[in-house]
Amino acid sequence: MSGKKVALVLFGTNFDYFVYIGASAKKTAEEAGIQLDVLNASDFVDLSEKVSQVVTIKYDACIVIGLPAIMADYQALGEAGIPVITYDSMVDGFDFSARVGSDNYVLGTQAAEEAIKYLESLDEINGEVICLNCPEGETMNSRARGFMDTIAARFPELTVNEQKLGATDSTAEGAQTYVDNLLVGKPKGAVCVIFGANAGMAMGATAACSIAGRDEIALFGIDNEAGQLQDLENGTYYKATVAQQPVKIGQECMRAAIAAVQGESLGDIGLPGIVVTPETVADFIAQQDKEYEALAPYKP
């Protein structure tokens, strides 16, 4: 492996999820004795610029986020003969050396199964189920479809109301304002469940319901940002989140990159989500803190 070098183009470092994918990959690379250079991208334009750097420097493999919107970047890497390993979403349309991440549709079904348990525990179900989605991202689209399909299969009589939010509304602040306004026209008894397809929408919706005192609404989401785990510890509004495994994703990305440097393609490496509830959140946080502490020196 001497002389070989791998690039990791890291996107979304305002979220712990991506930070620890990067940190885990760096630690794994160090242990394997291979050079890993981390290039932080702030937006799509910056991401393309970082990919251009990877091509110019002629890295032996590149780890980059899986997004349909950056297909041209994958193609540029492919034309340069650089194997591509994606993390997060498993996108189609390119011959990837490996795709590492969660099945986002399944994450949505896992969240829906927790919502179903909640609904089945009620004496009477009142109101509709709201799904907060950001259609601009295939990751969130897949999660929303998984959630809505699963709810509809179990409760065909329930109204599942998909709310399509723009990118600015899918942040915690944006989603809080959006749900604040949404609830004005939906009095008590009009809504029983709200699902947020990413951390921002889940946290924003939880904050809006909490401030409005709408404790008849149960919140469900995906991801395990610190704010979501705090909401679970409170337990009044946020009932379950489906956590991804950034540490393992980083490890598997680096394992796939090492294989790619040696001429081997590992294909799809799927990692399951972990359901976290108010009852299990303390143990989850303890385990996560232990993993994150070990990665502190490697954070980008």
Language-model features: locations:
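Hydrophobic alpha-helical segments within soluble ligand-binding/sensing domains
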Residues: 99-127, 142-143, 172-176, 224-229, ...
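Extracytoplasmic "Venus flytrap"
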Residues: 1-24, 28, 37-53, 57, ...
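Short, solvent-exposed amphipathic alpha-helices that sit
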Residues: 17-34, 107-114, 139-159, 174, ...
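Loop/turn elements at helix/coil->beta-strand transitions in domains of secreted/extracellular proteins
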Residues: 4, 33-34, 57-62, 80-84, ...
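Hydrophobic alpha-helical
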Residues: 48, 52, 61-80, 84, ...
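Immediate post-signal peptide segment of exported/extracytoplasmic ligand-binding proteins
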Residues: 1-6, 30, 119-126
